[in-house]
């Protein structure tokens, strides 16, 4: 018998680049599945407090004006953690 995980959260992040040291998260998206059925979602922009490079705007469609009044990462992560609860995360 194969065990299938049917309760989980799928997580997606958009960032200002690929360097974990130098780049920042600019958007968090998550979708909750219960019994394999989509039941809820979470999304927020994150103010990276740095300029979003033009190439990243081309890829993501997210520009400085879209994040300038967004939450900072600590507040955004607190909201994400509340959303996640104790669910397994796939990303």
Where are these regions (language model features)?
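Conserved non-catalytic scaffold segment of RNase H-like nuclease domains
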Residues: 1-91
């Amino acid at each position: 018998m194969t065990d299938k995980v049917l309760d989980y959260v799928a997580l997606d992040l958009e960032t200002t680049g690929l360097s974990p040291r130098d780049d920042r998260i600019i958007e968090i998206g998550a979708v909750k599945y219960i019994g394999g059925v989509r039941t809820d979602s979470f999304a927020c922009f994150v103010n990276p407090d740095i300029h979003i490079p033009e190439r990243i705007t081309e890829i993501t469609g997210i520009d400085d004006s879209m994040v300038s009044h967004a939450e900072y990462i600590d507040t955004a992560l607190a909201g994400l953690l509340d959303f996640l609860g104790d669910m397994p995360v796939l990303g």
